[in-house]
From Swiss-Prot:
S-adenosyl-L-methionine binds at residues 17, 47, 66-71, 87-89, 114-115, 132. CDD domains: AdoMet_MTases. The gene is gamt-a. Belongs to the class I-like SAM-binding methyltransferase superfamily. RMT2 methyltransferase family. PROSITE patterns: SAM_RMT2 (PS51559). It is an enzyme of class 2 (transferase). Residues 1-233 form the RMT2 domain. One of its GO terms (cellular component) is cytoplasm. GO terms for biological process: creatine biosynthetic process; methylation. It comes from the Eukaryota. This is Guanidinoacetate N-methyltransferase A.
């Protein structure tokens, strides 16, 4: 039913997202913005998997989307040198600034939509990238990660650098409506776009973990999660 979908046809939150209230619930297990389920604490093992990939080369890591600091906090446990984080929502960015003061590595908080910030970042600057932002429109629901990857991910990475990412809001819908095999979903809907962006298919790998979402999760109901590792050679 269309009423179950996260986005209505033609809906866009982009212009209002910056100022919208960041609704962290009392138990700090859910983050909701403009009525959208942005992140939930049950994702933790998966977020840690993404963070592990992004930190695997050490050095300077770029994280796009701060959310509940689940991946960010895990990244800080690794032997990295700098941790750059892009976040556009005011309330989430405030939490990022507070969190940054308590971390062991140099944090570079960058305020704004990634579309505004990323073009200002230099080529070959990062050893690892973790892209996990929320789709801000029905139009880009399934494709916003490719806009970043095709325009910027390859150029931002150093040779040997690694990219990982997710779009759970998209993948959850695809696994509900079109696919029952998560690896097939990734291979058919993601890999061709990564190759178009300049990455070689032999340098794209995935790992799958079992993780059962709570029954009330609106954006993901599949009982497996997939972590991509995409290396620039």
């Amino acid at each position: 039913m269309s009423s179950d979908k996260i986005f209505a046809e033609g809906e866009s939150c982009k212009s209002a997202w910056h100022d919208a209230t960041a609704g962290y619930d009392e138990t700090d297990t859910h983050l909701e913005i403009m009525g959208k389920p942005v992140m939930e604490r049950w994702e933790t093992p998966y977020m840690h998997s993404l963070a592990t990939v992004a930190a695997s080369k050490g050095g300077r890591v770029l994280e796009i989307g701060f959310g509940m600091a689940i991946a960010a906090t895990k990244l800080e446990e690794y032997n990295i040198e700098e941790h750059w984080i892009i976040e556009c929502n005011d309330g989430v960015f405030k939490r990022l600034q507070e969190w940054a003061t308590k971390q062991p590595h140099k944090i570079v908080p960058l305020k704004g939509l990634w579309e505004e910030v990323v073009p200002t970042l230099p080529d070959g600057h990062f050893d690892g990238i973790l892209y996990d932002t929320y789709p801000l429109s029905e139009e880009t629901w399934h494709t916003h990660q490719f806009n970043f990857i095709k325009s910027h991910a390859y150029r931002l990475l150093k040779p040997g650098g690694v990219l990982t990412y997710c779009n759970l809001t998209s993948w959850g819908e695809l696994l509900k409506t079109k696919y029952n095999d998560i690896e097939k979903m990734f291979k058919e809907t993601q890999t061709p776009q990564l190759v178009d962006a300049g990455f070689k298919s032999e340098n794209i790998s995935t790992t799958v973990m079992d993780l059962v979402p709570p029954e009330d999760c609106r954006y993901y109901s599949f009982k497996k999660m997939i972590t991509p590792t995409i290396t620039k050679v």
